[in-house]
Amino acid sequence: KLKEKISTKTRAILICNPSNPTGYLYSEKEIRALIEIAVEKDIFIIVDEVYREFIYTDESHYSVLKDESGSQHAIMIDSVSQRYSLGGARVGCMISKNKELMAMALKFAHLRLSPPTLALLASEAAIKAPPSYLKGVIQEYTQRKNVIIAALEKINGVAVSNPMGAFYCIVKLPVDSAEAFSKFLLTDFEDNGQTVMLAPAAGFYSSQELGKDQVRLAFVLESSKLKRAAEIIQKALEVYKNS
């Protein structure tokens, strides 16, 4: 099906591995298959691997740069934003073994403004963190994932995905419009002065017909706050259905 979508206007295949928002982890076999298509069609395959350490299964992350057969077609994107919780730093990189492509990228980079000095200094310090730091981070996110999934599964009518990686869940709600419910949470509902902000999932789909009853939830807060968020969502759903 992917091959059928590729036309003379297609320049690249772009994926995120693990995926935002689904948390899907592409296997080595799938990455190799995508590389094969990129080589056959003479296009690039661009893979955002910013979440590559955030894996919750026994499978390991397979980088697009590992396959030499696609070395002239593969581009890997990385950033300090997720790994070190530096979302505002806007410090990242693109890596490719295609020397001509990298030369063109460097020419373009000279025409753009550079990141703030403080962001660069913070990033330099962050990447020096020992392996034990990331190990602790992954353990914490694994616990958070398990906590929020368990809490949401207790809510009647709610279905939640179990992500293989990254730190997002796609949550199906018992509502016709997740966007309307998300707005309701922010404008018309509170529980003891608190509410929850959700991201409607419809915007992540290429088809307007999909994801209307889904939201993306990021488990980036400590477990106690995630439990509280699930409690608020449950109470809000009860009020929303009766309004």
Feature locations, PLM:
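PLP-dependent class I/II
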Residues: 1-243
